[in-house]
Amino acid sequence: MRVILVIGRSNSGKLDFIKALTGSLPKGLDDEAFNNDHSGLIHKYNIRNKYFEASVGIWIEEYSNLAETLDAYSSEEAKEVIDSLGAIVYTFRSFDEAEWSLFKNFIDKLQLEIPVIGLHMSDEKLLEPPDVFTPEYISISEEGVNEFNEKVGLDRVREILDCCEWNLSQVDKSFSEEKDDAGDFYLPERFKGSPDMQSTDLDNLMKEMNQIRDADLEKNEKKAKALNLLEKLLGDEFEENDYESL
């Protein structure tokens, strides 16, 4: 099972985030070994949604020099560690453009395909958040949805984590209905003969599926959008394992 890496400076809100996400704090906080540095603490996050249930591990990393820490994670010796990560949450109280750039370069260097969240642990959000796809800037102070009806704040973090591939045995599986890298989506055979599935529905579905395929999104987000689209169109006919036949 892959894990979540929560990384940040001392007093950057790592434990506040974990408490908000899971409802509890890691064991061992009273241990003298963790008095001045929370690196090495572990916890669990239980995911339950309509598609699966999983108990996902959380690793906590604390740094004083981010460049050195990311260099260590970029080394060949750390490849197994990187491969075991399903998501990274970088916590901070005050935005540091230099640190943000370090994370962006780290993601590009390793060609990471997992979600990387820049979580602003402050009561106020940035007026002009970084205009980059990843790390994704999220302000913990926001609630509900934005003007585009998209989840924000902690709900957005949960949404991202719900879409991750947590099972290591499935990491190398290609998402979607693509038969190859350049192919189109294909609908599961059992829907093609459905009396409720009209040709216009099929055409629209395939059009939207191909738009999802071509979108500049990570594989796990494409999968989530495809599943939501199928469920919306097919209603009671939709089965959770339909994406396995895509």
From Swiss-Prot:
PANTHER family per UniProt: INCREASED RECOMBINATION CENTERS PROTEIN 6
Gene3D superfamilies assigned to the protein according to its UniProt record, in alphabetical order: 3.40.50.11960
UniProt keyword annotations, A-Z: Phosphoprotein
A Gene Ontology term for the protein's cellular component: nucleus
Pfam family, one: Adaptin_binding
Name of this protein: Uncharacterized protein C19A8.11c
GO molecular function: protein-macromolecule adaptor activity
InterPro entries: Irc6 (IPR034627)
